[in-house]
Protein backbone atom coordinates (compact mmCIF):
# COMPACT_ATOMS: atom_id res chain seq x y z
CA UNK A 1 0.00 0.00 0.00
CA UNK A 2 1.48 3.34 -1.09
CA UNK A 3 0.37 6.76 0.15
CA UNK A 4 1.48 9.90 -1.72
CA UNK A 5 0.86 13.41 -0.39
CA UNK A 6 0.71 16.21 -2.97
CA UNK A 7 1.16 19.84 -1.93
CA UNK A 8 0.51 23.13 -3.73
CA UNK A 9 1.44 26.29 -1.83
CA UNK A 10 3.08 29.72 -1.61
CA UNK A 11 1.56 31.35 -4.71
CA UNK A 12 -2.24 31.21 -4.49
CA UNK A 13 -4.86 28.58 -3.70
CA UNK A 14 -2.66 26.29 -1.64
CA UNK A 15 -3.98 22.75 -1.35
CA UNK A 16 -3.22 19.21 -0.26
CA UNK A 17 -4.18 15.91 -1.87
CA UNK A 18 -3.66 12.30 -0.84
CA UNK A 19 -3.41 9.43 -3.30
CA UNK A 20 -3.54 5.82 -2.09
CA UNK A 21 -2.43 3.17 -4.60
CA UNK A 22 -3.34 5.50 -7.46
CA UNK A 23 -6.78 6.45 -6.08
CA UNK A 24 -7.51 10.02 -4.97
CA UNK A 25 -8.63 9.68 -1.35
CA UNK A 26 -8.91 13.35 -0.41
CA UNK A 27 -8.13 16.83 -1.72
CA UNK A 28 -8.86 20.24 -0.22
CA UNK A 29 -7.86 23.89 -0.45
CA UNK A 30 -6.43 25.52 2.65
CA UNK A 31 -8.75 28.53 2.26
CA UNK A 32 -11.73 26.41 3.30
CA UNK A 33 -10.26 26.01 6.79
CA UNK A 34 -8.56 29.39 7.30
CA UNK A 35 -11.50 31.31 5.75
CA UNK A 36 -9.01 33.44 3.81
CA UNK A 37 -9.83 33.34 0.09
CA UNK A 38 -7.03 32.08 -2.17
CA UNK A 39 -4.89 31.42 0.92
CA UNK A 40 -1.33 30.70 -0.23
CA UNK A 41 0.09 29.57 3.10
CA UNK A 42 1.44 26.10 3.84
CA UNK A 43 -1.69 23.85 3.90
CA UNK A 44 -1.35 22.55 7.46
CA UNK A 45 -5.08 22.01 7.98
CA UNK A 46 -5.52 20.61 4.48
CA UNK A 47 -2.78 18.03 5.07
CA UNK A 48 -4.24 17.09 8.45
CA UNK A 49 -7.64 16.57 6.85
CA UNK A 50 -6.20 14.38 4.07
CA UNK A 51 -4.24 12.25 6.55
CA UNK A 52 -7.33 11.91 8.74
CA UNK A 53 -9.48 10.86 5.79
CA UNK A 54 -6.95 8.13 4.99
CA UNK A 55 -6.62 7.16 8.64
CA UNK A 56 -2.84 7.53 8.68
CA UNK A 57 -0.14 9.74 10.17
CA UNK A 58 2.47 11.68 8.21
CA UNK A 59 5.03 9.01 9.11
CA UNK A 60 2.95 6.48 7.17
CA UNK A 61 3.11 8.53 3.97
CA UNK A 62 5.55 7.03 1.46
CA UNK A 63 6.25 10.12 -0.68
CA UNK A 64 5.58 13.84 -0.40
CA UNK A 65 5.65 15.87 -3.61
CA UNK A 66 5.54 19.61 -4.24
CA UNK A 67 3.74 20.78 -7.38
CA UNK A 68 6.56 22.85 -8.91
CA UNK A 69 10.32 23.40 -8.91
CA UNK A 70 11.13 26.67 -7.11
CA UNK A 71 14.79 26.84 -8.17
CA UNK A 72 13.80 26.82 -11.84
CA UNK A 73 11.31 29.61 -11.10
CA UNK A 74 14.10 31.59 -9.44
CA UNK A 75 16.23 31.10 -12.56
CA UNK A 76 13.37 32.46 -14.67
CA UNK A 77 13.08 35.54 -12.44
CA UNK A 78 16.79 36.30 -12.68
CA UNK A 79 16.89 35.86 -16.45
CA UNK A 80 13.78 38.02 -16.88
CA UNK A 81 15.15 40.91 -14.82
CA UNK A 82 18.46 40.70 -16.70
CA UNK A 83 16.66 40.74 -20.04
CA UNK A 84 14.60 43.82 -19.15
CA UNK A 85 17.28 45.72 -17.18
CA UNK A 86 17.48 48.50 -16.16
CA UNK A 87 13.66 48.40 -15.97
CA UNK A 88 12.10 46.84 -12.91
CA UNK A 89 14.59 47.72 -10.16
CA UNK A 90 11.89 48.23 -7.49
CA UNK A 91 10.17 45.01 -8.44
CA UNK A 92 13.52 43.17 -8.47
CA UNK A 93 14.36 44.36 -4.95
CA UNK A 94 10.93 43.30 -3.67
CA UNK A 95 11.12 39.91 -5.37
CA UNK A 96 14.67 39.18 -4.23
CA UNK A 97 13.76 40.05 -0.66
CA UNK A 98 11.04 37.40 -0.66
CA UNK A 99 13.18 34.82 -2.42
CA UNK A 100 16.34 35.28 -0.37
CA UNK A 101 14.43 35.17 2.90
CA UNK A 102 12.35 32.07 2.23
CA UNK A 103 11.44 30.94 -1.28
CA UNK A 104 14.99 30.07 -2.35
CA UNK A 105 15.17 27.68 0.58
CA UNK A 106 11.76 26.17 -0.03
CA UNK A 107 12.93 22.59 0.45
CA UNK A 108 14.14 23.48 3.94
CA UNK A 109 11.00 25.52 4.64
CA UNK A 110 8.77 22.64 3.54
CA UNK A 111 10.66 20.09 5.58
CA UNK A 112 10.49 22.26 8.68
CA UNK A 113 6.72 22.78 8.28
CA UNK A 114 6.15 19.08 7.61
CA UNK A 115 8.26 18.00 10.59
CA UNK A 116 6.31 20.33 12.84
CA UNK A 117 3.03 19.00 11.49
CA UNK A 118 4.13 15.38 11.83
CA UNK A 119 5.78 15.89 15.22
CA UNK A 120 9.01 14.36 13.98
CA UNK A 121 12.53 15.30 12.94
CA UNK A 122 13.19 16.37 9.36
CA UNK A 123 15.47 13.36 8.83
CA UNK A 124 12.53 11.06 9.63
CA UNK A 125 10.23 12.57 6.99
CA UNK A 126 9.20 10.61 3.89
CA UNK A 127 11.14 11.46 0.70
CA UNK A 128 10.30 14.97 -0.58
CA UNK A 129 10.07 15.25 -4.37
CA UNK A 130 9.48 18.20 -6.71
CA UNK A 131 7.42 18.07 -9.90
CA UNK A 132 7.40 20.62 -12.73
CA UNK A 133 4.43 23.01 -12.62
CA UNK A 134 3.01 22.16 -16.04
CA UNK A 135 3.69 18.47 -15.55
CA UNK A 136 1.52 18.70 -12.43
CA UNK A 137 -1.22 20.39 -14.47
CA UNK A 138 -0.92 17.82 -17.26
CA UNK A 139 -1.03 14.91 -14.80
CA UNK A 140 -4.09 16.38 -13.08
CA UNK A 141 -5.81 16.59 -16.47
CA UNK A 142 -4.90 13.20 -17.96
CA UNK A 143 -4.53 10.65 -15.18
CA UNK A 144 -8.04 11.16 -13.67
CA UNK A 145 -9.63 11.46 -17.13
CA UNK A 146 -11.78 8.70 -18.67
CA UNK A 147 -9.37 8.31 -21.61
CA UNK A 148 -6.64 5.73 -22.17
CA UNK A 149 -5.08 8.07 -24.73
CA UNK A 150 -5.48 11.84 -25.13
CA UNK A 151 -3.89 15.13 -26.07
CA UNK A 152 -3.28 17.32 -23.02
CA UNK A 153 -3.21 21.11 -23.33
CA UNK A 154 -2.17 23.23 -20.33
CA UNK A 155 -2.68 27.00 -20.39
CA UNK A 156 -2.13 29.28 -17.40
CA UNK A 157 -0.29 32.38 -16.20
CA UNK A 158 3.14 30.86 -15.75
CA UNK A 159 4.78 27.83 -14.17
CA UNK A 160 8.55 27.76 -13.97
CA UNK A 161 8.97 28.92 -17.59
CA UNK A 162 6.01 27.39 -19.43
CA UNK A 163 2.77 29.31 -19.95
CA UNK A 164 1.24 26.94 -22.50
CA UNK A 165 2.30 23.34 -23.03
CA UNK A 166 1.23 20.34 -25.08
CA UNK A 167 1.49 16.76 -23.88
CA UNK A 168 0.22 13.40 -25.03
CA UNK A 169 -1.00 10.87 -22.52
CA UNK A 170 -1.13 7.13 -23.05
CA UNK A 171 -1.68 4.60 -20.29
CA UNK A 172 0.53 5.67 -17.41
CA UNK A 173 2.79 7.93 -19.47
CA UNK A 174 2.80 11.65 -20.23
CA UNK A 175 5.03 12.85 -23.06
CA UNK A 176 5.83 16.58 -23.49
CA UNK A 177 5.76 17.99 -27.03
CA UNK A 178 6.24 21.76 -26.90
CA UNK A 179 5.93 24.83 -24.69
CA UNK A 180 5.36 28.57 -24.98
CA UNK A 181 7.53 30.40 -22.45
CA UNK A 182 7.15 33.43 -20.18
CA UNK A 183 6.56 36.36 -20.65
CA UNK A 184 4.28 35.28 -23.51
CA UNK A 185 1.21 34.05 -21.67
CA UNK A 186 -2.47 33.81 -22.53
CA UNK A 187 -3.33 33.61 -18.84
CA UNK A 188 -1.35 36.73 -17.99
CA UNK A 189 -2.84 38.56 -20.99
CA UNK A 190 -6.33 37.84 -19.64
CA UNK A 191 -5.20 38.81 -16.13
CA UNK A 192 -3.80 42.09 -17.48
CA UNK A 193 -7.25 42.97 -18.79
CA UNK A 194 -8.77 41.79 -15.51
CA UNK A 195 -6.48 44.27 -13.74
CA UNK A 196 -7.13 47.09 -16.23
CA UNK A 197 -10.92 46.78 -15.90
CA UNK A 198 -10.62 47.11 -12.11
CA UNK A 199 -10.97 43.50 -11.00
CA UNK A 200 -8.59 41.48 -8.85
CA UNK A 201 -5.91 39.39 -10.58
CA UNK A 202 -6.06 35.64 -9.86
CA UNK A 203 -9.61 36.11 -8.64
CA UNK A 204 -11.67 38.37 -10.89
CA UNK A 205 -11.00 36.74 -14.26
CA UNK A 206 -14.36 34.96 -14.16
CA UNK A 207 -16.05 38.35 -13.60
CA UNK A 208 -14.47 39.62 -16.80
CA UNK A 209 -15.82 36.56 -18.61
CA UNK A 210 -19.29 37.17 -17.15
CA UNK A 211 -19.17 40.85 -18.11
CA UNK A 212 -18.23 40.16 -21.74
CA UNK A 213 -21.76 39.49 -23.12
CA UNK A 214 -22.84 43.00 -22.09
CA UNK A 215 -20.30 44.54 -24.44
CA UNK A 216 -19.37 44.75 -28.11
CA UNK A 217 -15.97 43.32 -29.16
CA UNK A 218 -14.86 46.59 -30.73
CA UNK A 219 -11.24 46.37 -29.52
CA UNK A 220 -10.34 42.98 -31.03
CA UNK A 221 -8.31 44.45 -33.89
CA UNK A 222 -6.61 46.89 -31.52
CA UNK A 223 -5.48 43.98 -29.35
CA UNK A 224 -4.32 41.85 -32.27
CA UNK A 225 -2.54 44.76 -33.98
CA UNK A 226 -0.73 46.03 -30.90
CA UNK A 227 -0.64 43.56 -28.01
CA UNK A 228 -0.76 40.03 -29.37
CA UNK A 229 1.03 38.58 -32.37
CA UNK A 230 -1.21 35.57 -33.01
CA UNK A 231 -0.07 32.98 -35.54
CA UNK A 232 -2.33 30.74 -37.61
CA UNK A 233 -1.39 27.76 -35.45
CA UNK A 234 -2.46 29.52 -32.24
CA UNK A 235 1.02 30.22 -30.93
CA UNK A 236 1.63 33.82 -29.95
CA UNK A 237 3.93 36.51 -28.63
CA UNK A 238 2.99 39.51 -26.52
CA UNK A 239 4.31 43.02 -27.11
CA UNK A 240 5.89 43.59 -23.70
CA UNK A 241 6.10 47.35 -24.29
CA UNK A 242 2.49 47.50 -23.04
CA UNK A 243 2.80 45.24 -20.00
CA UNK A 244 4.39 45.64 -16.61
CA UNK A 245 4.03 42.17 -15.08
CA UNK A 246 7.47 40.86 -16.06
CA UNK A 247 9.41 43.46 -14.10
CA UNK A 248 6.92 45.83 -12.47
CA UNK A 249 4.51 45.96 -9.60
CA UNK A 250 1.41 46.26 -11.82
CA UNK A 251 0.05 44.27 -14.76
CA UNK A 252 -0.18 47.08 -17.32
CA UNK A 253 1.53 50.42 -17.89
CA UNK A 254 0.75 53.92 -19.17
CA UNK A 255 1.25 52.88 -22.78
CA UNK A 256 -1.46 50.25 -22.34
CA UNK A 257 -3.82 52.84 -20.82
CA UNK A 258 -3.08 55.28 -23.66
CA UNK A 259 -3.88 52.56 -26.20
CA UNK A 260 -7.37 52.17 -24.72
CA UNK A 261 -7.83 55.89 -24.13
CA UNK A 262 -8.16 56.05 -20.34
CA UNK A 263 -6.53 55.00 -17.08
CA UNK A 264 -7.35 51.74 -15.37
CA UNK A 265 -10.81 51.59 -13.77
CA UNK A 266 -10.63 52.02 -10.01
CA UNK A 267 -11.78 48.89 -8.17
CA UNK A 268 -15.42 49.07 -6.99
CA UNK A 269 -16.13 52.18 -9.09
CA UNK A 270 -19.14 52.02 -11.46
CA UNK A 271 -18.67 49.91 -14.57
CA UNK A 272 -19.01 51.72 -17.87
CA UNK A 273 -19.72 50.52 -21.38
CA UNK A 274 -15.98 50.79 -22.10
CA UNK A 275 -15.17 48.04 -19.59
CA UNK A 276 -17.92 45.87 -21.05
CA UNK A 277 -16.57 46.34 -24.57
CA UNK A 278 -13.02 45.61 -23.41
CA UNK A 279 -14.24 42.45 -21.65
CA UNK A 280 -16.05 41.32 -24.81
CA UNK A 281 -12.94 41.99 -26.88
CA UNK A 282 -10.42 40.08 -24.77
CA UNK A 283 -12.88 37.20 -24.46
CA UNK A 284 -13.15 36.97 -28.26
CA UNK A 285 -9.35 37.06 -28.56
CA UNK A 286 -8.96 34.35 -25.92
CA UNK A 287 -11.46 32.12 -27.68
CA UNK A 288 -9.64 32.71 -30.97
CA UNK A 289 -6.33 31.59 -29.43
CA UNK A 290 -7.85 28.53 -27.75
CA UNK A 291 -9.64 27.42 -30.93
CA UNK A 292 -6.50 27.79 -33.04
CA UNK A 293 -4.38 25.96 -30.48
CA UNK A 294 -6.99 23.21 -30.26
CA UNK A 295 -7.02 22.70 -34.02
CA UNK A 296 -3.21 22.66 -34.12
CA UNK A 297 -3.08 20.06 -31.35
CA UNK A 298 -5.58 17.88 -33.20
CA UNK A 299 -3.65 18.11 -36.47
CA UNK A 300 -0.33 17.47 -34.75
CA UNK A 301 -1.31 14.46 -32.61
CA UNK A 302 -4.38 13.10 -34.41
CA UNK A 303 -6.05 12.07 -31.15
CA UNK A 304 -9.82 12.35 -30.67
CA UNK A 305 -9.68 13.07 -26.92
CA UNK A 306 -8.48 16.29 -25.30
CA UNK A 307 -7.74 17.02 -21.64
CA UNK A 308 -7.40 20.57 -20.30
CA UNK A 309 -5.86 22.09 -17.17
CA UNK A 310 -4.29 25.36 -16.05
CA UNK A 311 -6.18 28.50 -15.07
CA UNK A 312 -7.26 29.29 -18.65
CA UNK A 313 -9.21 25.99 -18.65
CA UNK A 314 -11.60 27.66 -16.18
CA UNK A 315 -12.75 29.90 -19.06
CA UNK A 316 -15.87 27.84 -19.65
CA UNK A 317 -17.04 30.04 -22.54
CA UNK A 318 -13.88 29.20 -24.50
CA UNK A 319 -14.27 25.54 -23.50
CA UNK A 320 -17.81 25.51 -24.88
CA UNK A 321 -16.67 26.91 -28.21
CA UNK A 322 -13.81 24.41 -28.38
CA UNK A 323 -16.29 21.59 -27.82
CA UNK A 324 -18.74 22.87 -30.44
CA UNK A 325 -16.38 24.17 -33.10
CA UNK A 326 -13.17 22.23 -32.49
CA UNK A 327 -12.22 18.88 -33.96
CA UNK A 328 -12.03 16.79 -30.80
CA UNK A 329 -14.69 14.17 -30.17
CA UNK A 330 -14.37 14.33 -26.37
CA UNK A 331 -13.04 16.97 -23.96
CA UNK A 332 -12.37 16.42 -20.24
CA UNK A 333 -11.40 19.32 -17.99
CA UNK A 334 -9.81 19.00 -14.55
CA UNK A 335 -12.35 20.61 -12.17
CA UNK A 336 -9.55 22.11 -10.05
CA UNK A 337 -7.81 23.40 -13.16
CA UNK A 338 -5.84 26.10 -11.31
CA UNK A 339 -2.87 25.71 -8.99
CA UNK A 340 -4.86 23.86 -6.31
CA UNK A 341 -5.27 20.97 -8.73
CA UNK A 342 -1.49 20.78 -9.02
CA UNK A 343 -1.49 18.94 -5.68
CA UNK A 344 -3.46 16.07 -7.26
CA UNK A 345 -1.36 16.14 -10.42
CA UNK A 346 1.92 16.04 -8.52
CA UNK A 347 0.79 13.04 -6.46
CA UNK A 348 -0.47 11.15 -9.52
CA UNK A 349 2.78 11.93 -11.36
CA UNK A 350 4.74 10.18 -8.62
CA UNK A 351 2.44 7.14 -8.70
CA UNK A 352 2.37 6.71 -12.47
CA UNK A 353 5.62 8.23 -13.74
CA UNK A 354 8.12 8.09 -10.88
CA UNK A 355 6.98 4.70 -9.56
CA UNK A 356 5.82 3.45 -12.99
CA UNK A 357 2.56 1.97 -11.73
CA UNK A 358 -0.05 0.96 -14.27
CA UNK A 359 -3.10 3.16 -14.69
CA UNK A 360 -6.68 1.94 -14.48
CA UNK A 361 -9.03 4.14 -16.50
CA UNK A 362 -12.17 4.86 -14.48
CA UNK A 363 -15.59 5.89 -15.78
CA UNK A 364 -16.98 8.54 -15.74
CA UNK A 365 -13.57 9.67 -14.38
CA UNK A 366 -11.37 9.23 -11.30
CA UNK A 367 -12.32 12.50 -9.56
CA UNK A 368 -15.36 11.12 -7.67
CA UNK A 369 -17.38 14.10 -8.88
CA UNK A 370 -14.73 16.32 -7.24
CA UNK A 371 -16.39 15.61 -3.88
CA UNK A 372 -13.08 15.07 -2.11
CA UNK A 373 -13.38 17.31 0.95
CA UNK A 374 -14.74 16.94 4.50
CA UNK A 375 -18.16 15.55 5.31
CA UNK A 376 -20.16 15.82 8.53
CA UNK A 377 -22.55 13.32 10.06
CA UNK A 378 -26.04 14.13 11.29
CA UNK A 379 -24.77 13.55 14.82
CA UNK A 380 -21.99 16.11 14.42
CA UNK A 381 -24.40 18.61 12.89
CA UNK A 382 -27.00 18.21 15.63
CA UNK A 383 -24.35 18.60 18.33
CA UNK A 384 -23.41 21.94 16.78
CA UNK A 385 -27.01 23.11 16.32
CA UNK A 386 -27.89 22.27 19.95
CA UNK A 387 -24.83 24.07 21.32
CA UNK A 388 -25.34 26.93 23.78
CA UNK A 389 -23.83 29.44 21.36
CA UNK A 390 -26.29 28.51 18.60
CA UNK A 391 -29.50 27.00 20.00
CA UNK A 392 -30.86 26.66 16.49
CA UNK A 393 -34.44 25.65 15.73
CA UNK A 394 -34.63 22.79 13.24
CA UNK A 395 -36.66 19.85 11.96
CA UNK A 396 -35.26 16.44 11.11
CA UNK A 397 -36.49 14.60 8.01
CA UNK A 398 -35.73 11.08 6.87
CA UNK A 399 -34.22 10.64 3.42
CA UNK A 400 -37.64 9.48 2.25
CA UNK A 401 -39.22 12.81 3.20
CA UNK A 402 -36.32 15.28 2.93
CA UNK A 403 -36.10 15.77 -0.82
CA UNK A 404 -39.84 16.28 -1.29
CA UNK A 405 -39.88 18.80 1.55
CA UNK A 406 -36.99 20.82 0.09
CA UNK A 407 -38.49 20.63 -3.41
CA UNK A 408 -41.69 22.25 -2.08
CA UNK A 409 -39.65 24.94 -0.32
CA UNK A 410 -37.81 25.73 -3.57
CA UNK A 411 -40.98 25.74 -5.64
CA UNK A 412 -42.34 28.36 -3.24
CA UNK A 413 -39.68 30.82 -4.40
CA UNK A 414 -37.36 30.36 -1.42
CA UNK A 415 -33.58 30.45 -1.50
CA UNK A 416 -31.97 27.46 0.21
CA UNK A 417 -28.50 26.85 1.58
CA UNK A 418 -27.74 23.22 0.66
CA UNK A 419 -25.04 21.42 2.68
CA UNK A 420 -24.65 17.73 1.86
CA UNK A 421 -21.91 15.08 1.76
CA UNK A 422 -18.29 15.83 0.98
CA UNK A 423 -17.17 19.36 0.11
CA UNK A 424 -16.11 20.08 -3.46
CA UNK A 425 -12.45 20.42 -4.51
CA UNK A 426 -11.91 23.30 -6.93
CA UNK A 427 -13.56 26.69 -7.38
CA UNK A 428 -17.09 25.50 -8.21
CA UNK A 429 -19.90 24.47 -5.87
CA UNK A 430 -21.45 21.32 -7.32
CA UNK A 431 -24.28 20.51 -4.95
CA UNK A 432 -22.21 19.77 -1.86
CA UNK A 433 -21.92 23.34 -0.57
CA UNK A 434 -24.42 25.27 -2.71
CA UNK A 435 -27.07 27.97 -2.54
CA UNK A 436 -29.98 26.87 -4.70
CA UNK A 437 -33.23 28.27 -6.04
CA UNK A 438 -35.97 27.99 -8.66
CA UNK A 439 -34.65 28.96 -12.13
CA UNK A 440 -38.15 29.87 -13.34
CA UNK A 441 -38.33 32.75 -10.87
CA UNK A 442 -37.81 36.10 -12.63
CA UNK A 443 -36.40 37.83 -9.52
CA UNK A 444 -34.13 34.98 -8.36
CA UNK A 445 -30.99 36.27 -10.12
CA UNK A 446 -31.14 39.76 -8.64
CA UNK A 447 -32.19 38.52 -5.17
CA UNK A 448 -29.31 36.05 -5.02
CA UNK A 449 -26.76 38.58 -6.25
CA UNK A 450 -27.74 41.57 -4.15
CA UNK A 451 -29.32 40.17 -0.98
CA UNK A 452 -27.53 36.88 -0.47
CA UNK A 453 -24.18 36.88 -2.27
CA UNK A 454 -23.71 40.68 -1.89
CA UNK A 455 -21.95 40.79 -5.24
CA UNK A 456 -22.10 42.63 -8.55
CA UNK A 457 -25.54 42.56 -10.17
CA UNK A 458 -24.27 41.68 -13.65
CA UNK A 459 -22.96 38.26 -12.67
CA UNK A 460 -24.86 35.24 -14.00
CA UNK A 461 -25.88 32.10 -12.13
CA UNK A 462 -25.38 28.53 -13.24
CA UNK A 463 -27.94 25.76 -13.69
CA UNK A 464 -27.74 22.28 -12.22
CA UNK A 465 -29.65 19.89 -14.47
CA UNK A 466 -30.48 16.20 -14.40
CA UNK A 467 -27.75 14.64 -16.55
CA UNK A 468 -30.18 12.69 -18.74
CA UNK A 469 -32.27 15.83 -19.39
CA UNK A 470 -29.48 18.27 -20.32
CA UNK A 471 -30.42 18.16 -24.02
CA UNK A 472 -34.02 19.12 -23.19
CA UNK A 473 -32.91 22.50 -21.88
CA UNK A 474 -29.53 23.30 -23.46
CA UNK A 475 -27.65 23.00 -26.74
CA UNK A 476 -25.40 20.34 -25.24
CA UNK A 477 -25.33 16.61 -25.83
CA UNK A 478 -22.67 15.45 -23.39
CA UNK A 479 -22.01 15.56 -19.64
CA UNK A 480 -20.68 18.71 -17.98
CA UNK A 481 -20.35 17.55 -14.36
CA UNK A 482 -17.93 20.27 -13.27
CA UNK A 483 -19.68 23.40 -14.55
CA UNK A 484 -16.84 24.06 -17.00
CA UNK A 485 -18.76 24.23 -20.29
CA UNK A 486 -21.05 27.03 -21.44
CA UNK A 487 -23.81 26.30 -23.93
CA UNK A 488 -26.93 28.11 -25.09
CA UNK A 489 -30.41 27.60 -23.70
CA UNK A 490 -32.49 25.76 -26.30
CA UNK A 491 -34.18 28.10 -28.74
CA UNK A 492 -37.69 26.81 -28.01
CA UNK A 493 -37.26 27.82 -24.35
CA UNK A 494 -36.21 31.38 -25.17
CA UNK A 495 -38.64 34.26 -24.90
CA UNK A 496 -39.09 36.75 -27.76
CA UNK A 497 -37.84 40.24 -27.02
CA UNK A 498 -39.94 43.31 -27.72
CA UNK A 499 -38.57 45.86 -30.22
CA UNK A 500 -37.75 48.10 -27.25
CA UNK A 501 -35.85 45.30 -25.49
CA UNK A 502 -33.93 44.53 -28.69
CA UNK A 503 -32.55 48.08 -28.61
CA UNK A 504 -31.21 47.81 -25.06
CA UNK A 505 -27.46 48.18 -24.74
CA UNK A 506 -24.86 47.16 -22.18
CA UNK A 507 -26.01 46.82 -18.59
CA UNK A 508 -29.55 47.79 -19.67
CA UNK A 509 -29.84 44.16 -20.85
CA UNK A 510 -29.85 43.01 -17.23
CA UNK A 511 -33.09 41.69 -15.71
CA UNK A 512 -34.83 41.14 -19.05
CA UNK A 513 -36.27 37.58 -18.92
CA UNK A 514 -34.74 35.74 -21.86
CA UNK A 515 -36.09 32.24 -21.42
CA UNK A 516 -38.47 30.10 -19.41
CA UNK A 517 -35.50 29.71 -17.03
CA UNK A 518 -34.66 33.41 -16.56
CA UNK A 519 -32.54 33.00 -13.41
CA UNK A 520 -29.88 30.96 -15.24
CA UNK A 521 -30.05 32.49 -18.73
CA UNK A 522 -27.30 35.05 -19.34
CA UNK A 523 -27.87 38.09 -21.56
CA UNK A 524 -26.48 36.19 -24.58
CA UNK A 525 -28.82 33.21 -23.91
CA UNK A 526 -25.96 31.11 -22.55
CA UNK A 527 -25.60 29.12 -19.33
CA UNK A 528 -22.67 27.56 -17.44
CA UNK A 529 -24.01 24.04 -17.07
CA UNK A 530 -23.58 21.42 -14.37
CA UNK A 531 -25.00 18.00 -15.17
CA UNK A 532 -25.93 16.08 -12.01
CA UNK A 533 -25.37 12.32 -11.93
CA UNK A 534 -26.78 9.75 -9.47
CA UNK A 535 -23.42 7.95 -9.32
CA UNK A 536 -21.50 10.93 -7.91
CA UNK A 537 -24.11 12.96 -6.00
CA UNK A 538 -27.21 10.83 -5.36
CA UNK A 539 -28.76 13.25 -2.84
CA UNK A 540 -28.57 16.30 -5.09
CA UNK A 541 -29.83 14.15 -7.96
CA UNK A 542 -32.81 13.02 -5.86
CA UNK A 543 -33.63 16.62 -5.00
CA UNK A 544 -33.64 17.52 -8.69
CA UNK A 545 -35.87 14.53 -9.45
CA UNK A 546 -38.33 15.60 -6.75
CA UNK A 547 -38.28 19.20 -7.97
CA UNK A 548 -38.95 17.99 -11.52
CA UNK A 549 -41.84 15.81 -10.34
CA UNK A 550 -43.36 18.81 -8.58
CA UNK A 551 -42.71 21.52 -11.19
CA UNK A 552 -41.95 19.71 -14.45
CA UNK A 553 -38.55 21.47 -14.37
CA UNK A 554 -35.40 19.36 -13.95
CA UNK A 555 -33.16 22.37 -13.35
CA UNK A 556 -32.11 24.36 -10.27
CA UNK A 557 -30.11 27.56 -9.84
CA UNK A 558 -26.79 26.66 -8.21
CA UNK A 559 -24.26 29.10 -6.81
CA UNK A 560 -21.50 28.61 -4.28
CA UNK A 561 -22.41 28.70 -0.58
CA UNK A 562 -20.60 31.89 0.47
CA UNK A 563 -20.80 35.66 0.23
CA UNK A 564 -18.51 37.79 -1.89
CA UNK A 565 -14.90 37.50 -0.75
CA UNK A 566 -15.57 34.46 1.45
CA UNK A 567 -14.32 30.96 0.64
CA UNK A 568 -17.04 28.34 0.10
CA UNK A 569 -18.34 27.12 3.46
CA UNK A 570 -16.71 23.99 4.84
CA UNK A 571 -18.32 23.20 8.20
CA UNK A 572 -21.86 23.36 9.63
CA UNK A 573 -20.69 26.39 11.62
CA UNK A 574 -19.57 28.19 8.44
CA UNK A 575 -22.89 27.35 6.80
CA UNK A 576 -25.09 28.47 9.69
CA UNK A 577 -23.15 31.72 10.09
CA UNK A 578 -23.51 32.53 6.37
CA UNK A 579 -27.20 31.58 6.50
CA UNK A 580 -27.89 33.91 9.41
CA UNK A 581 -25.96 36.83 7.93
CA UNK A 582 -27.72 36.79 4.58
CA UNK A 583 -31.30 36.75 3.35
CA UNK A 584 -31.41 33.03 2.63
CA UNK A 585 -34.80 31.58 3.58
CA UNK A 586 -33.87 28.02 4.54
CA UNK A 587 -30.78 25.99 5.42
CA UNK A 588 -30.53 22.24 4.82
CA UNK A 589 -27.69 20.54 6.73
CA UNK A 590 -27.83 16.88 5.70
CA UNK A 591 -31.22 15.78 7.13
CA UNK A 592 -31.91 18.94 9.14
CA UNK A 593 -34.04 21.76 7.75
CA UNK A 594 -33.85 25.22 9.33
CA UNK A 595 -36.22 28.09 8.52
CA UNK A 596 -34.77 31.58 8.89
CA UNK A 597 -37.95 32.88 10.51
CA UNK A 598 -37.72 30.25 13.27
CA UNK A 599 -34.15 31.04 14.35
CA UNK A 600 -33.33 32.92 17.56
CA UNK A 601 -32.99 36.64 16.95
CA UNK A 602 -29.45 37.91 17.19
CA UNK A 603 -28.01 41.38 17.32
CA UNK A 604 -27.18 42.51 13.83
CA UNK A 605 -23.43 42.79 13.38
CA UNK A 606 -22.95 45.16 10.48
CA UNK A 607 -19.17 44.74 10.53
CA UNK A 608 -19.11 41.07 9.57
CA UNK A 609 -18.61 41.75 5.86
CA UNK A 610 -15.29 43.39 6.73
CA UNK A 611 -14.00 39.91 7.66
CA UNK A 612 -13.62 39.10 3.98
CA UNK A 613 -11.51 41.10 1.56
CA UNK A 614 -13.55 41.79 -1.57
CA UNK A 615 -12.52 39.64 -4.52
UniProtKB/Swiss-Prot annotation:
Q: What is this protein called?
A: Uncharacterized protein sll1178
State the signal peptide span: none
Q: Which GO terms describe its biological process?
A: biosynthetic process
Keywords recorded for this protein, A-Z: Transferase
Which is one GO molecular function term here?
A: transferase activity
Mind telling me which PANTHER family this protein's record contains?
Answer: NODULATION PROTEIN U
Q: Which domain of life is it from?
A: Bacteria
Q: Which Pfam families does this UniProt record tie to the protein?
A: Carbam_trans_C, Carbam_trans_N
* Annotated family: Belongs to the NodU/CmcH family.
